[in-house]
Each structure stands twice: as C-alpha cells, then as structure tokens.
Amino acid sequence: MTTGSLLAYLESEGYDCYAASVGPISSAWDRACELYAQLTGTTVDYGAAHSAAHNHDRYGKTYAQPLFSGWGPEKRIHLFGHSFGGATVRLFTQIACEGIQEEIDASPTDVSPFFRGGMDSWIYSVTTLAAPHNGTTMDGAMREDDATGAIYLPLTTLAGAIGNLPVVNGMYDFQLSQFGLTTLPGSYAFNVARLSEMLNFTTSRDHAGYDLSLRGAYDLNCQIKAQPGIYYFSYAACATQADGKGNWVPISSMETIFKAPSFLIGRKAEPYTTSFGLEINAEWRQNDGLVNTI
C-alpha cells in the first residue's frame, strides 16, 4: 500500500501496461468474464449455464473499446494478479485456453468466444503476487461450515447494502449489476425486491467470500491446471514473525489496518484436516496481514 504503483513503475521502465477493473467482491468466474470483455471491447457474458446456476443476469457491462488493440498470437500478454487477482488470472487463463464445454452446450449458437477456448497462444505468462491460492484462514472475517462449504461473509452483506446508499454509490461501484445490486449514482433503491437480490448474492457461492475460503479455493484448484507453453510465477509475502509461543505476529511496519486479521491468521491453534483433505497446521500461521504465506 505504501510502496507505490507497480503499473506506474513498469511503465517508467518502458513496458506497455494496462489495468482492468473487475468486481471487487465478485467471484473469480465473474471477474474472469469481466476481464475478457475489457480485453476485447465487448459485452460481459457470464455464461448461460453459470448465470442460470447462480440466478443472475447473463450479460453485464458493455465496453466500447478494448484495453488495447491487437490482442492475439502476435501480441501475447503477461497477466499479473495481486491477492484475489491471482485466482482471477489463473481461472481466466484456464477458460481462455480450454474453454468451458458446459457453456458451449448451454448456448451453442451464441456462446462467447471466451468459453470456446483455444487462446493458449494469446497468453505468455501468469504472475501472482500474495495470492491466496489455497484460500485464507482469516476466521475472524469469514466462517466456514466445512461440511457444506457455506460461507457467511459479513463484508459481502455489508457491501450489498451500503452499495445502494447515495453517499456510497456516487463514489464507489461494487460492480454487481448482474445481481441487480447497482443503482444510478446518487440514487437510492431499497425494497423487498432489493433485499431479495442481496440475499441471493450473499447466500450464493458466486462471490469472493466463497472463493477465498478454504473450500472455495479448493473447488477453484480442481478446475484450474497449468497450461503448456505458458509461464507461471507466484510470489508470496510474509509480514509476521514468531513470538516464541507458537504464534506469528505482525512486524512493526505492517499497516495498522491489517494487524487484527494478521493476529487471527497467525494465532496458535490445533492442527486439523478439512473434510476435503486439506491439512491446516502451523505452516499456515505466517501471513502478510490478509493472506497466508504458504
């Protein structure tokens, strides 16, 4: 947060860099679809099968112009994803390369080219920075029912609610129009229908809260594999130190806002194994304030 903009630094070194804007609390799937639309200058297509399964609109925002011209085999891209952006670019690469047969079957005549795949020669590398590839154990912010994978994330509920307040939606867009949770800047719309839309979003598995959970990350990892011919790099971060009592605590220079969740992740706890076979032990305590270093 305090070391500057990677985008600006790379541009100063002579690289052509572009930043996409995707839903901050949307699922990795929805974010990948939004990234594709921005790269191609098209309308966001979340997929007929996916949208039906999660009870939201199939189409989203339309981008009149691509982020840059000429994306393709002759102009391959290097993808960078920070934090949850790591899951986003990994899933994006998986879909772009192999496609999604379920989406092709659901709408064979108008399926998005994204879901047809075949773009493996369009991507040169994938780099993730402090990404929770295996989910996060930040139990203080999210609570997981391991048997069902149900996630209760106060942040998503809060965002769905305050995103409709005039003082907020005039300044910040949570980009949840597919769920009907975006209103005109400065306007206010909250009624029974809007409450239903909020509940549909927060109780589904189609949001960042689920994908950031241990179970959600496991589900994503079952879908994603490294693609031949594409380079993958992953950089982890650690801003904690051992306190001699079995805990990993924040270093003094950690941003204050991250210290509370860092304590929650780094506290000593009994090892356990999830219902899907993931062993959570002392190696999970090191963290960067939000994301486990492991």
Predicted regions and their residues:
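Helical cap/lid subdomain of alpha/beta-hydrolase-fold lipid enzymes
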Residues: 94, 100-294
